[in-house]
Amino acid sequence: MEKSKAKQGENEHMPVNNPSTQIYQLQALASELKTGFTEAMQELTRIQHGEYALEEKVKSCRCSMEEKVTEMKNSLNYFKEELSNAMSMIQAITSKQEEMQQKIEQLQQEKRRESRKVKAKKAQKEEHGAQAGPASAPAPGSAPTQGSPFRSINVPEAGLPSDDFTNMLPSQNYEKAQESRSVHVGDSNVKGMMGPGVNPTTPESDENLKPSLSAEIQSKGHHTPGLWRQPKEGKEWGEEYVTKDHPDKLKDAGQGRHSSLENVLCETSLAAKRQTVALELLESERKYVINISLILKIKATFQGSDGKRNPKERSLFPGSLRYLVQQHLDLLHALQERVLKWPRQGVLGDLFLKLTNDENNFLDYYVAYLRDLPECISLVHVVVLKEGDEEIKSDIYTLFFHIVQRIPEYLIHLQNVLKFTEQEHPDYYLLLVCVQRLRVFISHYTLLFQCNEDLLIQKRKKLKKSSMAKLYKGLASQCANAGQDASPNAGQEAVHDSGVHSEEMLQPYPSSSSSAPAVSHLMAPAKKGQQQQSLMESMQPGKPGDWELEGRKHERPESLLAPAQFCAAEQDVKALAGPLQAIPEMDFEPSSAEPLGNVERSLRGPPELLPDARGFVPAGYEEFEYGGEIFALPAPYDEEPFQAPALFDNCSPASSESSLDICFLRPVSFAMEAERPEHALQPLPKSATSPASSSGAYKLEAAQAQAHGKAKPLSRSLKEFPRTPPAEGVAPRLYSTRSSSGGRAPLKVERAPAPHGPAAAAAASRGAPRTFFPQQRSQSEKQTYLEEMHLEDATRFCPKEERESEQTSFSDQNPRQDQKGGFRSSFRKLFKKKNGNSTGEDFCGPWGWW
């Protein structure tokens, strides 16, 4: 019993201790589980971050691989396209080679067949000669008789097919070129505006065509069955090799090969001619840049020789000259880059479109040069005459003349390029637009071109006559003293003192682009002495009438054709020392007492400038030739004579050739250039008026002289200006290359009210605004038209302060607030009427109403 009680007590005691230990154990296990779970969660988080990083890497690698695969696909596709194009080109070339090979084989067979025919005929003739007798037997190498169609053929047994084929090309090229040259001669436009009578074919082209001429003769002699007998030869070949089943098909195939070969040869010939014309244009531009660079050298010589020269003498050269030189230099570089790297379809029209564009201002500066040129010529005449250097004067006149003719030369060259350009060519439309722009420009400024050329020609002729007179005087004195104690070198010294050299005694001008100008002061002294000695030996002393007749021999006849346009490259050095080439001069040089109503100009019929661009010239235009050039001019030019030639006859003998008597005569018209843009190098003053604008002061003076029955005498400087019948002029910038509308038509000219009746009537008649093509002027306006052109340019002789004072409008000037005395009042007496009016009525002068 005690034992059972003890066991029960132990059992009762045990449950008391077990729960606490169990709880403790459970807590320990729970903490272990918690730490393990935390570590597991941390590990899981690290694993998840690693997976995210790997996923990003996989995505980036996938994108890069996709891009690379896409690039590879694109490159593969591009390579496939290029490969297909190359294969197609190879196939086309292969087919062409097969055609050419067939043609060569055909030609070789024909050659062999004809050689057999020739040998058979020779054998027959030898047999016939042997039968007739040994006397009639021909030599072994003799040609057949006249009846044989192959009398000029001496064909060997066999020949290379390549020789046959290449020998045919020069023949066809030259025959086509010969046709184009005949078109050149027949088309009077191509005789052109570049220098009087200058042929568009150049010495280079002539020299290049000489070998082709010999090749043509040989090809005609030795290859008579050439290109022009291909249909017949094709028929013979077909008859020889055709089968009985399909004869027509083989004949058609042979004729198709003939036509395809002819087309290929014609295309190559046209491209070669176009490249030749482009090379001529490049050579012309190169020589022209050399010429105008000589003007800058002369200008630097003048300015550097005397640093104290006044500003008026420094304006011997137009202010726009340096800008024009830069433009032509840029054009030369562009042409060299294009022409020397000439592709199959070379383009030149974009260069001239850029040159003649409104934003480029090249044509504006060219017009400025044409307007400044009369002033510069007068200054050259005065300043250089004072210094006594006639060599430089002759060179300056020659170089000035080259620049005047450059725009017409461009028209000639572009027409030649356009003539050998197909309508499908990318340059065809560009050249057509350039030709149209140049025609419009030349037609608008025809009078400026004509007046400058006439003035330069007359100055050159006067210089030549004065130089000849000095030469004859020197020769006469040398011959008179020859018997006494004159040294052998006296004649050379006399010739040198006279300022005349051999090239100055020949012709008034060289051709504008035929060669570099004959700058006499650049010649070697030894060569000058040889030429002068030969002149002295060729001339003997005689009467003055004989000298005059001898001098006329050197003048150029009007109908003489000028030499070719360009010289070869090896002749450039000789051209500097060669004589001056000639240009056709005007048909008249009237004396001061000759009435201008009798003056006539030579006219030519209207030629075909360009068959593809006839529509650009107005229908009412005729072709007028001045200086050997042909330009469109309004028809009334030769139909309107002077109505009052007495105004030009009684000229003041006391007036000098200085600029003092012509610089007061022109009032300024400011509205003409109101919309003209300003340029940094703009040489034109704001007061530059158009050839059609009126000179109010001079017309008023002429009207008053007519009202009082007296003719106002003109100064000698006005007599030097070329007297030509009046033409319908236009405003200086009436045209626009962007549109043909009169968008730049000048505003209405403001004028001060005239106190006299005739002056008011004249001002009222001139006050109406002008249209794009002005109306025909009245007879009173035609009388003083050419004088106005000269006086307009001569106003630039005034000092700079006077020209600046002219920049205000007439309506803003107070006519009575001008200064009295000084430079202005000293010449006030020149404008008073000569009717003995003691009050001395004032009238409109260049500075307003006095």
Swiss-Prot record:
Q: Which residues carry this modification: Omega-N-methylarginine?
A: R766
Q: Which residue intervals define the domain DH in the entry? A: 273-448
Looking at the keywords, is rRNA-binding present? Answer: no
Compositionally biased intervals (Basic and acidic residues)? 1-13, 98-113, 784-806
- The biased composition feature labelled Low complexity covers 130-149, 510-520, 754-770
Coiled coil, from the record: 54-128
Chain intervals for the UniProt region annotation (Disordered): 1-21, 98-209, 504-550, 702-850
Composition bias type Basic residues, residue spans = 826-835
- Give the record's keywords alphabetically: Coiled coil, Guanine-nucleotide releasing factor, Methylation
Biased region (Polar residues) positions are 164-175, 773-783
Gene3D superfamilies documented for this protein:
Dbl homology (DH) domain (1.20.900.10)
Which Pfam families would you find in this protein's record?
RhoGEF (PF00621)
InterPro entries for this protein: ARHGEF33, DBL_dom_sf, DH_dom
| SMART domains tied to this protein | RhoGEF (SM00325)
**MF terms (GO), sorted A to Z:** guanyl-nucleotide exchange factor activity
Question: Any keyword Coiled coil?
Answer: yes
Instruction: State the superkingdom.
Output: Eukaryota
> Can you say what this protein is called?
Rho guanine nucleotide exchange factor 33
Gene (name only): Arhgef33
